[in-house]
A protein has these predicted regions:
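Structured catalytic-domain cores with a bias toward divalent-metal coordination
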Residues: 1-158
Length: 158
């Protein structure tokens, strides 16, 4: 009975997804991504003056129509190799077949694709960050804490 009642109700589309208002630019890492475009950016996992900042690639597919924002993360554990492969394939030219990319002109919403989050772990084929902490257990993180927690905080906020 409850299921039938729920099926009878019409869910409204959130106002921010309304197609009447048009799509606005998507802001990510202080960059503006125009509707109907794909941008490839680099994100520094750490804000450091000395040492490596661990830059990782981020692809943003911003649809021409309003919709949700979805972030896909791979290699949160550096020893898990299927996620980076799948997300790299998703960004590739043959994902839609016949040398076709994802078409942002027909997409509603935004997809942010990050094939490798745990870059140091991925390079060493290790689940953990160099400080022996598990990134997956560190979210939402703390910008004033250990390395893993700082990275988790940056990924969470962006």
């Amino acid at each position: 009975m409850e299921i039938e009642k729920a099926l009878g109700e019409v869910a409204e589309t959130p106002a921010k997804w309304s197609r009447n208002g048009g799509t606005k630019n998507h802001n990510f890492l202080k960059k503006r991504i125009k509707p109907g475009t794909i941008r490839h950016l680099e994100y520094d996992l750490l804000d450091v003056e000395i040492g490596e900042s661990w830059p990782i690639p981020v692809s943003v597919v911003h649809g021409s129509r309003p919709g949700p924002v979805v972030t896909l993360l791979g290699a949160v554990h550096g020893d898990e190799l299927v996620g980076p492969l799948a997300l790299t394939y998703l960004c590739g030219a043959n994902f839609m077949g016949d040398d076709r990319l994802i078409d942002p002109s027909v997409l509603a919403g935004t997809i942010r694709i990050v094939p490798i989050v745990n870059l140091p772990g991925y390079r060493r084929r290790s689940r953990y960050f160099p400080d022996r902490r598990d990134l997956n257990r560190s979210f939402p993180g703390n910008p004033d804490s250990n390395t893993t927690s700082r990275v988790a905080s940056g990924v969470w906020k962006n």
